[in-house]
Swiss-Prot record:
EC code: 3.2.1.28
Record organism: Mus musculus (Mouse)
Superkingdom of the organism of origin: Eukaryota
Keywords from the UniProt entry: Cell membrane, Disulfide bond, Glycoprotein, Glycosidase, GPI-anchor, Hydrolase, Lipoprotein, Membrane, Signal
Gene Ontology CC: one annotated term: plasma membrane
Localization (cell): Cell membrane
Main function: Intestinal trehalase is probably involved in the hydrolysis of ingested trehalose.
GO biological process: animal organ morphogenesis; trehalose catabolic process
A UniProt-annotated Pfam family: Trehalase
Propeptide: 554-576
Subunit structure: Homodimer; disulfide-linked.
Protein name according to UniProt: Trehalase
Gene: Treh
Residues at the active site: D318 (proton donor/acceptor), E511 (proton donor/acceptor)
Length: 576
């Protein structure tokens, strides 16, 4: 089924033509079509992602032909038991096309460990360093030979995955993973991951959300330029930068061409960026949930809802009250309006990328391009200060295009321009500290909450996420004020305390933490909390590197000697 036929099908469902959008990819198995619909709606698996991550045992044409015959026999209403048998006969379990990979550049005892004064934390950091070996993946040759038999996007070089259900690469997760890998002295692994991303830009014009074809039409927060900056700073590999500077520019062009919006403020028009994914149908990896959610809105609004869900996924915050700004009940996921918001963090990331590109081109001797990106950054900075900055509150806020005003709710992303260095007022870090105090954020002792609203979504209270801790901590650390610096350290201490406590109890790191009651693995959202976990490990290593001479494991836990901690960890692993 081509997407044109998909469009006709949607029209047959009563959707207006301007709302009938193309599917996320052409595959009639992994992205749209009757097979996907019947399998996912039958709920053969608890997690919708499981089916679309399974590879085919034979060609797609043969699978579709066999399915068509089965559907005809059952008048297109196949019983669950027969569907289960069909999938078991024609699909292979998740992960068959991947093999575990131990990075060749992994080694014992990287130097940063010596910076950590607390013996318990040093032993723990060694354990985190070892986890890289568990998260390494390499694609089998069959993914390249038979790409149509898998939803995986082929990557030439091995990579580090987040962990748990996420057995493929993810875009913005990889930045914090790479920071941790560089501390672990694994620059070769980082270079391979960077090369994979650069290859994706050359092939598709952008980096998809993750390494599956059903993610192809949406990206994630644009951190590729920053990844390159950290790699070059660590290795001095300017030749690699020079070879790929044009590809970095192409990725930023994708955001300029496809994700910009004009905003009028003070009688002047400004251009800023937003998340926007004009592709229809339920997300394949959350198909049943999206299809059922669509039943709660008028038929003609369903394609818009699905596109907004994809834009929310592109933001990395899937999902959050940040985007639930439409309709009478803002806590309902059906009120999502991601594309109607101008996000502070997205524009901060792009502002930072434009500054880095200017620096890169200067370093490479191309003054014309350096000036171009310097001017782009200046234009964005002016736009952000006019549209997103609130002097009275001392923070930046997402701008609601439909309501014509800022969303003044608390989110750590409100301080992302500070982290990105995208500001002109040198006292802004101290203003940000006052904003945190006024918002009562410093009263939370186990981490910075993702919001102050408990909607049941995973990117809201009471969850706390590693990348958002980083945005605030390193943002405040830019201040020259000793007090603001001290608060940055205390926030780092709080986060390390939570990570270490949970690890000591469960011998695992998690993608998110519930900071409402002493700190434990987070919840909410569309799936169970995942272990691993790439960016959590990366940030923990970053904070241990930065504040290793000050951080402590806590009074109660400090009574355990390092050998006791190791013994406890080994025992827990043996019992698993």
């Amino acid at each position: 089924m081509t997407w044109e036929l998909h469009l006709l099908l949607l029209l047959g469902l009563g959707l207006r033509s301007q709302e009938a959008l193309p599917p996320p990819c052409e595959s009639q198995i992994y992205c749209h079509g009757e097979l996907l619909h019947q399998v996912q709606m039958a709920q053969l698996y608890q997690d919708d992602k499981q089916f679309v991550d399974m590879s085919l045992a034979t060609s797609p044409d043969e699978v579709l032909q066999k399915f068509s015959e089965l559907a005809t026999v059952h008048n297109h209403s196949i019983p669950k038991e027969q569907l289960q048998e069909f999938v078991q006969s024609h699909f292979q379990p998740v992960g068959q096309e991947l093999q575990s990979w131990t990075p060749e550049d992994w080694k014992d005892s990287p130097q940063f460990l010596q910076k950590i004064s607390d013996a318990n934390l040093r032993v723990w950091a060694e354990e985190l360093h070892k986890i890289w070996k568990k998260l390494g993946k390499k694609m089998k040759a069959e993914v390249l030979s038979y790409p149509e038999r898998s939803s995986l996007i082929y990557s030439k070089h091995p990579f580090i995955v987040p962990g748990g259900r996420f057995v493929e690469f993810y875009y913005w997760d990889s930045y914090w993973v790479m920071e941790g890998l560089l501390l672990s002295e694994m620059a070769s692994t980082v270079k391979g991951m960077l090369q994979n991303f650069l290859d994706l830009v050359k092939t598709y014009g952008h980096i998809p959300n993750g390494g599956r074809i059903y993610y192809l039409q949406r990206s994630q927060p644009p951190l590729l330029t920053l990844m390159m900056d950290r790699y070059v700073a660590h290795t001095k590999d300017v030749a690699f930068l020079q070879e790929n500077i044009g590809t970095l520019a192409s990725e930023l062009d994708f955001w300029t061409v496809n994700r910009t919006v004009s905003v009028v403020s003070g009688g002047q028009s400004y251009v800023l960026n937003r998340y926007y994914v004009p592709y229809g149908g339920p997300r394949p990896e959350s198909y049943r949930k999206d299809a059922e959610l669509a039943n709660s809105v008028p038929e003609g609004d369903r394609e818009t809802l699905w596109a907004e869900l994809k834009a929310g996924a592109e933001s990395g915050w899937d999902f959050s009250s940040r985007w639930l700004v439409g309709g009478p009940d803002p806590d309902l996921l059906s009120s999502i309006r991601t594309s109607k918001m101008v996000p502070a963090d997205l524009n901060a990331f792009l502002c930072q990328a434009e500054e880095l590109m200017s620096n890169f081109y200067s370093r490479l001797g191309n003054d014309t391009e350096a000036t171009k990106y310097r001017n782009l950054r200046a234009q964005r900075l002016a736009a952000m200060e006019a549209v997103l900055w609130d002097e009275q509150k001392g923070a930046w806020f997402d701008y609601d295009l439909e309501k014509g005003k800022k969303n003044l709710e608390f989110y750590p992303s409100n301080l992302s321009p500070l982290w990105a260095g995208c500001f002109s007022d040198p006292s802004v870090a101290d203003k940000a500290l006052k904003y945190l105090e006024d918002s009562k954020i410093l009263t939370y002792q186990y981490g910075i909450p993702t919001s102050l609203r408990n909607t049941g979504q995973q990117w809201d209270f009471p969850n706390a996420w590693a990348p958002l801790q980083d945005l605030v901590i390193r943002g405040l650390a830019k201040s020259a004020s000793p007090r603001t610096q001290e608060v940055a350290f205390q926030l780092a201490q709080n986060w390390i305390k939570t990570n270490f406590k949970v690890y000591s109890q469960k011998s695992a790191m998690f993608e998110k933490y519930d900071i409402s009651n002493g700190g434990h693995p987070g919840g909410g959202g569309e799936y169970e909390v995942q272990e691993g976990f790439g960016w959590t490990n990366g940030l923990a290593l970053m904070l241990l590197d930065r504040y290793g001479d000050q951080l402590t494991s806590g009074t109660q836990l400090a009574s355990l000697g390092p050998h006791c901690l190791v013994a406890a960890l080994l025992l827990s692993l043996l019992l698993q």
